[in-house]
């Protein structure tokens, strides 16, 4: 696959990958809980909270048949340059994108270290088929996306029990939770 920095939309069998960005008027109590988490078009695309995004893939290295990248949001203004990372429970989201993060960095300077590229999560792309090296055919190559521990990214159901009845949503996850493993491919590739 592409061994340089590029920008592309990330798609899977459930459509385009996007981010939750819920307007306050839509869910005043839960919008802050969900904003920044990654989801798919199929499960959230019909809601006002789904925002399709593109990513910048910064190539790091190729080892053991896998390509390693740092991945950041390339769509703005709110999520521009947000880092694709996972929380301690394995949920995937964009980190370091909001002005509030900048304010927190001023108050707690050690959190500035998290912005250093060397400390950002890396993601492994495992191709599921051969690629002929032609950029135009790269959009047809499927791959798994794995976290630093080797877990494949899946779409997993999350329940919010603070409401009655509980809210059911699906987000991207890499870890031990049961879900549908995603087979990704790229769209609208732009090599830098």
Which residue stretches match the model-derived regions?
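Lectin-like carbohydrate-binding module/patch detector with strong preference for beta-trefoil
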Residues: 1-192
